[in-house]
Amino acid sequence: MYAAFYGHIEARYLRLTIGFSSSWSKTLSEIDIYKIDSEDPTVYAVTGTENLITGKITHRQTGSTSDVNASFSAYATVASTSGYTVSVAADNSLVAAYNTAHDTSYAALSAEYLQLDNSTLTIAAGAYKSEGEVTVSLKGDLTRLGDLNGYLAPLKLSSSGAGTSAGRGVVYL
C-alpha cells in the first residue's frame, strides 16, 4: 500500500499507525510533523530542524567565499479567500534570545552581508503555500567576518492578514 499527501492535512489531533507485514520492506523514509499552536490564521516556514539554515565562510589569502545559498517557502495554517502577503526581513534583535535559548554566542550578521531575494511572498487565495520562495545568500567583502563563534541572521516572517507562528515564524541563518 502507498499513501501520499501533498499539501496540508488539517486535524486537531493526528494519529499515525504503521503496520508492516513480513513480506513488505520495513523502510520508512521520513515523517516530520510540525505543530503550529494557533487557531487563528498563522504564517510560518519550515526549513529543517528548528528553522536553522547552516553554511560556512572560507577565508583564503585570495579572498573569502561562502556556501550559504538557501531558499524557503512561506505557509499558512488557514487558506484565505483573498490570500496573504508575507514579508521576510532580518531582525537582529532576536540574536540575544536565540543565544540564551541555545547556549550559543553567535554575533549578529550585519545586513550589509545578507542578500534576500524575493523577500515578499504571496500565498494565493485558497492556498496554503507561497507561490515563490525567499532566496538567501551572503554578499560583499566576507573577509571582515572573523568572529570564531559564528554569525546569526534571524529572518522574521510577517503578514498583515495573519499572525506569525511563535515556533516557526523565524528562519535562522
Give each language-model segment a name:
Residues 144-147, 160-173:
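Beta-sandwich strand segments
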Residues 140-152:
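Short glycine/proline/serine/threonine-rich loop/turn segments at secondary-structure transition edges
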Residues 1-38:
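Aromatic, loop-rich ligand-recognition surfaces of beta-strand-rich domains
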Residues 39-76:
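Beta-sheet-dominated interaction scaffolds and their linkers
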Residues 76-85, 96:
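A short beta-turn/strand-edge loop motif at beta-sheet boundaries
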